[in-house]
Amino acid sequence: MFGKGGIGNLMKQAQQMQEKMQQMQEEVANLEVTGESGAGLVKITINGAHNCRRVEIDPSLMEDDKEMLEDLIAAAFNDAARRIAETQKEKMATVSSGMQLPPGFKMPF
């Protein structure tokens, strides 16, 4: 079922992947990504833990209506969260690449 090397080889791969996962999680936690809305009029920077680090609002929006500004802030945050999720997914793909997992094996994360 596991081919030459058997379960020992699979366990070694799992340990290597666990080490790579820990490294990737540390990298992502330190990562900062900026989301935008309104063609860059509102920018929100969040870290890998989805904590807001910075909010930038173009001064021209301060005179507009409050509801529109709130919508732009929410959209910018959602854009930043989407970008973090994409980055996490890309980094996860690099962690699991090269592993010889059995067909149908699902990752636990």
Swiss-Prot record:
Superkingdom of the source species: Bacteria
On assembly, the entry states: Homodimer.
Q: Which InterPro entries match?
A: YbaB-like_sf, YbaB/EbfC
Q: Does the keyword DNA-binding apply?
A: yes
Record-given protein name: Nucleoid-associated protein ECA1177
GO function term, MF aspect, one: DNA binding
Gene3D superfamilies (alphabetical)? Nucleoid-associated protein YbaB-like domain (3.30.1310.10)
Listed A to Z, the keywords are: Cytoplasm, DNA-binding
By sequence similarity, the record places it as follows: Belongs to the YbaB/EbfC family.
Q: Give Gene Ontology CC terms.
A: bacterial nucleoid; cytosol
Cell compartments where the protein resides: Cytoplasm, Nucleoid
| PANTHER family per UniProt | NUCLEOID-ASSOCIATED PROTEIN YBAB
Disulfide bond annotation, renumbered to this chain: none
Q: What does this protein do?
A: Binds to DNA and alters its conformation. May be involved in regulation of gene expression, nucleoid organization and DNA protection.
